[in-house]
Amino acid sequence: MTAERGPRSPGTGQKLRLRATEPMPQWTAKNLHALLDLPAAMELRQIELIYRAEGNANLVLALPQFKKVLRLPKMISSRLRQAAHQRHELADEVARPEGQRVSSERAGTENAGDLTMPDFMAYIGIMRRLLGNEFVCGADIVAIPKEDDRFWINEHIRAQRPVSRLDKEFVGPFGLLLPDVTQLPATFDVLLANLQAKGTTGDESGAAAGVGDGGGVGRGAGTRTKNRSAVRRLGDTYAIEIKPKQGWLQLASDVNDLFDLMPSGAVTKPKETTCNQEENEPSARDKCWCRFCSMQLLKMHNGKIKRLGHYCPLDLFSGTPSRMLDALDALLACPQNNLRVFQNSNLIYGDHANSISFDELSSRVFPGEIMVLIKHLLVACLLREYEHPESKRAEGSNQSQKQQQEQPEPEQLNQSRVSIAATETKAGAAGIGAANVVLPLGGRAAAPVVTAGQSSTRTRAAAATATTQRYTKVARVETTITRQAATSMAAGPASSSQLSGNVLATATATATATAMATSGRTETKTEPETPAEAASTTSRNVNQNESQKLNRNEPANQTQAQNNKTEIFRLPKNCVLQKILNLQLLVKVSQPIKLLPKLLSLCPFGFVYSACPPENLGNCR
């Protein structure tokens, strides 16, 4: 491929060669009649279309009979543009030929549709490779070529649309047809109908309705109608949509001098603080920023929202069940546009005009403990692993067995004891969770010297506590890892004769210290030391004592700056939150954060609370 590059534009030659060897897949557009198996004589207005939602670029319409949704791109139509700018463009409209104007607009619309839909399909393919097939639904390109059908769609949903969104319409001629995730798939209806036919559900009427002979088209349709009514008697279908927002932090020091972007008219009045407060409070440039909590106050000031919510994306992406439950409580109490609840594919709770109140949601829809059950179910779904961990454990055990077979017998015995102790302590620390692993000031974990019996008792108790956890085990990883906490307990006994009796205690204490420092994956192994290694260990202890004395004399601001670095909470590798977080970081981490000068004028010192409690947003001055 490199030999065929052009001398003038090598990049272009390579790009053309890649397109020739790896052509983009061709997607063909089909009409609704072909995709939904409708009669050719049926018109579009005979199909039930329900307005679902819309954003800045797309309209979403539901087809409840087919459990599908239409995603239609929207733009400012020529009719609305002419109505808004009729006076200003009157001279241009008279001078320009009418036929030329209409043909150019039609060509531009068709070109936009031809280019947009394949781009959407390619984007969906990329999302499938990044997130997985279990999180991304397939789509089909649907063609709506008739202008009368597009006009009817716009007029049919105009009354349900927000007034602020009426400046854009669906001008076609293409859209996307996707599954409606607010309803159970059609395979579930077939499964429930079969269960009712066998009498498994205990609904005799449903069983009788599902047995029909099915002779003829009319009888088959009647049987399906009876089955659907019987399925509905089993209960309602609820769907909860969450828009999590940005779930990662950005240090103020990584932003391009936010305080230099402050408007010249903004005057800051520093708060009077004592010397002790200045030492205890970290610098604003070293604290973490939460973009969502920052933008909430700006929206409140501009009148886009009526009240501040208590939701913070950091709680939802923390991986800690208690914090995730707090985030769900905040979303349910003040959903704004970040949470919506559907009942049988109908939107019943959200920020729309006809939404029910939170009291009605908690008393009528999800009364009593059902609301608690729903929130715990959401947390379990968000933290669910979409792989089988048993296979990985089996592979890891096979590899460890092969390594142990190759080692000598005495070393193998000591190594097995060390690995057992390290595994117990690591499982205990990971099971307790990040909220229960607290590091002292400076990020240094002080590991006490314990005996083998005490360490074994504590680690087994921690492991027993870990088994009572309801959700997936979560551990917290500090970005600043101090070497002293990890190496202070690595020094073995100076005498080689005492090593055989204390190897288990030393390994357990070492693993405990490392787990407290990193709260996660770091594994430590202790092997029998020679006299030369013992001497080197003694010299390392002396150097560590000297370094500790030097560290005590370090400025307090450096130690505090290390504590205020961003913390990354470890989520399960293949859960949906981790997938979303990876995608957010992939898109945004390489781009500088742009905050409006208006935001800085509202709050000169910035929103610098690492947890971003909403009640503190107004007190940041």
Swiss-Prot record:
Annotated GO MF terms: ATP binding; inositol-1,3,4,5,6-pentakisphosphate 2-kinase activity
InterPro entries: Ins_P5_2-kin (IPR009286), IP5_2-K_N_lobe (IPR043001)
Catalysis performed (reactions): 1D-myo-inositol 1,3,4,5,6-pentakisphosphate + ATP = 1D-myo-inositol hexakisphosphate + ADP + H(+)
Keyword Metal-binding annotated: no
Composition-biased stretches (Polar residues): 540-565
Annotated region described as Disordered, given as residue ranges: 1-20, 87-111, 201-226, 391-416, 514-565
Entry keyword annotation includes Nucleotide-binding: yes
Assigned keywords, A-Z: ATP-binding, Kinase, Nucleotide-binding, Transferase
GO cellular component: nucleus
Residues spanned by motif EXKPK motif: 241-245
Compositionally biased tracts (Gly residues): 209-221
Composition bias, Basic and acidic residues: 87-108
Top-level taxonomic group: Eukaryota
Compositional bias (Low complexity): 397-416, 529-539
Enzyme class: transferase
A GO biological process held by the record: inositol phosphate biosynthetic process
UniProt-listed Enzyme Commission number(s): 2.7.1.158
Free-text comment on this protein's domains from its UniProt entry: The EXKPK motif is conserved in inositol-pentakisphosphate 2-kinases of both family 1 and 2.
Family (UniProt): Belongs to the IPK1 type 2 family.
Function: Contributes to the formation of Ins(1,2,3,4,5,6)P6 (InsP6, IP6 or phytate). Phosphorylates Ins(1,3,4,5,6)P5 at position 2 to form InsP6. Together with Ipk2, they are the main contributors to higher InsP synthesis.
Protein name: Inositol-pentakisphosphate 2-kinase
Species the sequence originates in: Drosophila melanogaster (Fruit fly)
